[in-house]
């Protein structure tokens, strides 16, 4: 914790899509559960020309659309917390008026900054100009934080002129998901897994982040970024680091992030033969015809909408264990999961093909369903006169069913509450971000050097056939 709980929250981009779908519903839900300090005031700012009343109407419509009815209790009192100040971030004098609107917090100010990368520097200068960057102010930064290591340096250096690292909260919303946090509990609160969590007992790990959607209004950003920078550089590498990290000394921000960055720095440079890129063409998803990427974009493009990578972590625990990463748009289903495949038993005592055991698998479902499945080998019931027959049996834990009482929360609820209260454990430190970019930039450099262009795949499929071959040449099948 950084010493104070804020009693003012300043939301940049307060009339944008993220605020409408995630931030305002999350804050209202926290308020309904009495998790926000009664003194907390929330000031929204954006270019939209609204007053307090207009912003409250905007927020009410957002809550009615995106927050379930059973979580809207006390919506009227939440709306009374809200006020609004229009702002052109490129004009310094606007920050004087914004500072007047924010007022003088008794305890401290938390800022949530979601803006285009080009506006980070002028916004930070404006906050300094308006006196909104003092010792009792912390800032949360929503991606994208650059498009490569160099631009990330520029943004982080600009932020550091006003906010030291202990008051800078870089957001990766995947870390706010309950099952992602549960990965640490699964590993470090259960003695059965940790002794096996290494190259001696694990054959390989798969991490899949699949989307059914296409561009969905992110045309400009996505065509500049592509799947590697949009998904792998942040979300997927954070998941990988949680799977692979050493046990931290304790569960606090410094200890957890120290171990994550060790993993990221141990990532082996990827050869071009260990990657596959793709771009979707027209097809069908859920029985509905969908256009190809170029059709949605309105022009030809070499941007990848799919990437598969065979990664390695060069340290003692994970030497030569492949980590297969796969993400893409317009895939058959929306799913995020981690699959850990253990090695086969070294010798089977059971004779015959029917007794051939399959390796154990641990599957951690992150979205849409939050579940944990461990596959074990068991004897098929019956009188086995020709020898025991074995079959894999799944042990399923559906997390919402296992914990029937707690609400299923939006990932941003956890992150906004931690930003307000000053807990950095689930936020990304600068050295993590830079280690991620360094690895991703090297992959992009390999692509450019070898003139790699995306292979095509049909929307509704699991990507280019080359992605299947990437795993199958190692005797591995993607978990689907």
Describe the predicted segments one by one.
Residues 1-140, 145-480:
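Secretory/organelle targeting and membrane-embedding segments
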């Amino acid at each position: 914790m950084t010493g104070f709980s804020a009693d003012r929250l300043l939301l940049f981009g307060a009339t944008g899509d993220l605020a409408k779908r995630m931030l305002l519903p999350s804050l209202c839900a926290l308020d309904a559960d009495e998790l926000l300090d009664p003194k907390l005031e929330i000031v929204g700012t954006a270019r939209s020309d609204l007053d307090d009343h207009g912003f409250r109407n905007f927020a009410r419509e957002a809550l009615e659309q995106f927050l379930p009815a059973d979580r809207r209790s006390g919506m009227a009192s939440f709306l009374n917390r809200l006020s609004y100040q229009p702002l052109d971030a490129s004009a310094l004098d606007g920050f004087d008026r914004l500072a007047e609107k924010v007022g003088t917090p008794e305890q401290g100010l938390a800022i949530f900054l979601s803006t285009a990368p080009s506006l980070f520097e002028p916004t930070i200068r404006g906050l300094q100009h308006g006196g909104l960057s003092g010792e009792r102010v912390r800032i949360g930064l929503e991606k994208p934080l650059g498009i490569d290591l160099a631009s990330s340096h520029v943004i982080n250096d600009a932020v550091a002129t006003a906010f030291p690292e202990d008051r800078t909260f870089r957001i990766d919303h995947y870390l706010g998901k309950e099952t992602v946090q549960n990965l640490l509990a699964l590993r470090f609160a259960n003695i059965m897994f940790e002794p096996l969590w290494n190259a001696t007992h694990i054959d390989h790990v798969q991490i899949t982040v699949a989307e059914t959607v296409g561009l969905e209004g992110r045309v400009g950003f996505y065509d500049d970024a592509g799947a590697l920078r949009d998904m792998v550089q942040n979300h997927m590498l954070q998941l990988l680091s949680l799977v692979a990290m050493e046990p931290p000394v304790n569960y606090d921000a410094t200890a957890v992030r120290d171990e994550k960055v060790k993993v990221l720095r141990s990532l082996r440079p990827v050869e071009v033969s260990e990657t596959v890129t793709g771009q979707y063409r027209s097809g069908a998803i859920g029985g509905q015809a969908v256009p190809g990427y170029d059709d949605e974009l309105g022009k030809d493009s070499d941007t990848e909408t799919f990437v598969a990578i065979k990664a390695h972590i060069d340290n003692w625990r994970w030497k030569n264990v492949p980590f297969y990463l796969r993400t893409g748009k317009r895939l058959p289903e929306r799913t995020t999961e981690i699959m850990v495949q253990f090695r086969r038993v070294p010798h089977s005592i059971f004779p015959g093909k029917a007794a051939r055991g399959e390796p154990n698998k641990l599957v951690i479902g992150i979205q849409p369903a939050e579940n944990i499945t461990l596959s074990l080998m068991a004897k098929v019931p019956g009188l086995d006169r020709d020898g025991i027959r074995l079959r894999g049996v799944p042990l399923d834990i559906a997390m919402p069913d296992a914990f029937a009482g707690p609400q299923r929360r939006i990932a941003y609820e956890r992150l906004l509450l931690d930003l307000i209260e000053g807990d950095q454990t689930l936020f990304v430190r600068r050295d993590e971000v830079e280690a991620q970019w360094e690895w991703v930039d090297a992959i992009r450099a390999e692509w450019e050097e070898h003139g790699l262009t995306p292979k095509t795949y049909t929307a509704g499929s699991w990507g280019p056939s080359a992605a299947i071959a990437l795993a199958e040449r190692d005797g591995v099948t993607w978990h689907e």
